[in-house]
Every structure is written in C-alpha cells, then in structure tokens.
A protein has these predicted regions:
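Core beta-strand-centered patch of the WYL/Sm-like small regulatory domain
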Residues: 139-156
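N-terminal low-complexity or simple alpha-helical regulatory segments
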Residues: 1-131, 145, 153
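Conserved short histidine dyad/triad with adjacent acidic residue
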Residues: 132-138
Length: 156
C-alpha cells in the first residue's frame, strides 16, 4: 500500500457539499433519491448538518450527478457545461508557462463555458487579485446551498 492510502479510505466530506451538489438536481424538479442510493448515501443524512459521508461515496455521487444531468456543472448555472468541457479548460491552463498566464486564460475561457460567471485578474507587483463574479443571480438567496456550492466548486 502506498503512503497515505489509509487516509483516503477514511476521508470524509461534510454533508453540506452533498446538499449543494444536489441543488441543481432539485432545481430541475428531479428527485435525487436514486442518485443518493446508487452512491450508497442514506438520504436521511441530509437532514443533519453535522453528517459526513465517505469521500468515495461523494466522488461517486459527483460523477453520477454530472452524468445524469449531462452537465459537468451539476445544473447550477443557466447554461450546462457539457461533458469534456472541464478537461479542455484544464488542458488549456496546464499548458500555460506561468500562473499569471494560466489565470488570464481562465478569465478568458470560463465565461465561454459558464456565461453566468466572470473572472478578473489584477496584478499588484508580486501579488495578484482574483475576483470571481456571477453575472446573474445564481439563486434567490445568497446562502442558497447551490449558489454556495457553485462558488466553492469553482474556487477549488
């Protein structure tokens, strides 16, 4: 076994990430029960904020939601992010010679994939400021689980 493999088996994810991930499913009027069951997640855990699930179950759910919605952005934005889009974005960024170049590419390309979002990058000497802005409200309330998850997902 490789170093750290025991940690991967015991790693967990807060249930809030599951709630956020499922927000797009619910917005489309779909019941997430089958997706949760297929990933081995007890739906009752969603009612308890302190709940955690295994990282492996979360990863399974993450992939199932993207596949079910045909959207790598999980139905959280007005325009779906078609399968393969994220890989193309990552490849474009990975080919950059510098972090500055990668961030500027991200600022140009992300709005093509997700028109609801803009990114601004400003350099201040050796430091840079990165601003992620929604061009339209992603939800009626700023604390909406889907809106919060959308920003967390994009910032990871």
């Amino acid at each position: 076994m490789g170093k750290g493999s025991g940690h991967a088996k015991s790693a967990t994810v807060a249930i809030g990430f599951v709630t956020g991930l499922l927000a797009g499913v619910r917005r489309q009027g779909r019941d997430p029960a089958d997706l949760l069951a297929a990933a081995g997640i007890d739906a009752a855990l969603l009612a308890r904020d302190e709940s955690r699930i295994p990282l492996t179950a979360y990863a399974d759910l993450y992939n199932r939601v993207a596949l079910a919605l045909d959207d790598e952005a999980f139905g959280l934005f007005a325009t779906p992010m078609r399968p393969g889009s994220f890989e193309l974005l990552v490849r474009a960024l990975a080919g950059a010679r510098t972090l500055d170049e990668a961030l500027r590419r991200l600022a140009r390309f992300l709005p093509i994939l997700l028109p609801d979002m803009t990114i601004a990058v400003e350099r201040h000497g050796a430091q840079a400021e990165f601003t992620l802005t929604a061009t339209r409200p992603l939800a009626a309330h700023p604390a909406d689980a889907g809106r919060v998850f959308a920003f967390e997902w994009l910032l990871r």
